[in-house]
Amino acid sequence: MPKKFGRIHLVVMDSVGIGAAPDADKFFNHDVETHEAINDVKSDTIGHISEIRGLDVPNLQKLGWGNIPRESPLKTIPAAQKPAAYVTKLEEISKGKDTMTGHWEIMGLNIQTPFPTYPEGYPEDLLEKIEEFSGRKIIREANKPYSGTAVIEDFGPRQLETGELIIYTSADPVLQIAAHEDVISREELYKICEYVRSITLEGSGIMIGRIIARPYVGEAGNFERTDGRRDYALSPFAETVLEKLYKAGIDTYSVGKISDIFNTVGVKYDMGHNHNDMDGVDRLLKAMTKTEFTEGFSFTNLVDFDAKYGHRRDVEGYGKAIEDFDGRLPEIIDAMKEDDLLMITADHGNDPSYVGTDHTREYIPLVIFSKSFKEPKVLPVGHFADISATIAENFSVKKAQTGESFLDALV
């Protein structure tokens, strides 16, 4: 069957959820002060930002963000009388609310065994191996779930004095190593992270979803994380649609941390890591306007919504970031060809008004736009992997483990 769209561009607004998922009662955040576990049933990332701060997003509104099915309408994003895009929301079936699980399911995998997390910190034998390899001691007090900004505030001054490593985790299946660039170079930090990755793979006795290098600079009281972040992920456990496209000879472009999330599997052209989300949009536009990119798939992650504002529970910053992205949408649409398809979605929620600091179990919004559409409408509620099933059908490759294509509905 001839392809309907020559190029498909998928943009993940990291953590921009649109209301609690049906199984949100099984997922929890912990009150920072009382440590009480509160389920995610009342989470609603877009809804609460729209209600508390307000959102001025004329471009997303025209596309139909306000038309996405909800129990109550978005306070400051009215439904469009004639939305310019197909819209819906998608439910996750995998047993996790982390970045890897969300992205892997979007690409067609069904993760029923959640990645292990380490709420009590990492075991002593692992820390000792890292110390032996690196020749540096580890600050044991940091070895627990920690906010990335708080951990360098609390232990950065000590690291500047002693050169010890700051190793911490979160509610996600990650091991993060923070290193001040004046004390531990990026090159050294990356080597340590590569070593930790090599000893924490599946079957090693302690499996970790991602190892993350977190370089930072500055002085005590004014530390700032840099754009030198690197993620060392596991390779997907099964073949994703991204990999199927690559193997079929279809050009695949990654923007932002997509290449890290999939451990480069299925990525032909990596446009690099984003300095920030606006830089990420610039990199997407650079890919879209490449003369050689005539057919294929681009996959973009914009992480600031999550990393800078969601985890820090910054409603104002989060709302401003959404508005900034909305302001760039005309450029993205202008760069589209007549037979391009643009899909804008998320990978989980991270309600900045919610208790705790963790992701929230939510539906994700889906906007589907092409200049060729005649009368777009609201689609039935689906599942994350429907995105990749649609991409797979368009490019005549087999879908992955799960997902139902909605390609025929796009006219």
Swiss-Prot record:
Gene Ontology terms for molecular function: magnesium ion binding; manganese ion binding; phosphopentomutase activity
Organism: Lactococcus lactis subsp. cremoris (strain MG1363)
Its job: Isomerase that catalyzes the conversion of deoxy-ribose 1-phosphate (dRib-1-P) and ribose 1-phosphate (Rib-1-P) to deoxy-ribose 5-phosphate (dRib-5-P) and ribose 5-phosphate (Rib-5-P), respectively.
Gene: deoB
Record keyword Manganese present: yes
Keywords associated with the record: Cytoplasm, Isomerase, Manganese, Metal-binding
Top-level taxon of origin: Bacteria
Gene Ontology CC annotations of this record: cytosol
Binding-site positions, Mn(2+) 2: D306, H311, H359
Binding site for Mn(2+) 1: D14, D347, H348
Source organism phylogeny: Bacteria, Bacillati, Bacillota, Bacilli, Lactobacillales
UniProt GO BP: 2-deoxyribose 1-phosphate catabolic process; 5-phosphoribose 1-diphosphate biosynthetic process; metabolic compound salvage; nucleotide metabolic process
The protein's enzyme class: isomerase
Keyword match Manganese: yes
The protein's name: Phosphopentomutase
Catalyzed reactions per annotation: 2-deoxy-alpha-D-ribose 1-phosphate = 2-deoxy-D-ribose 5-phosphate; alpha-D-ribose 1-phosphate = D-ribose 5-phosphate
Protein location: Cytoplasm
Pathway: Carbohydrate degradation; 2-deoxy-D-ribose 1-phosphate degradation; D-glyceraldehyde 3-phosphate and acetaldehyde from 2-deoxy-alpha-D-ribose 1-phosphate: step 1/2
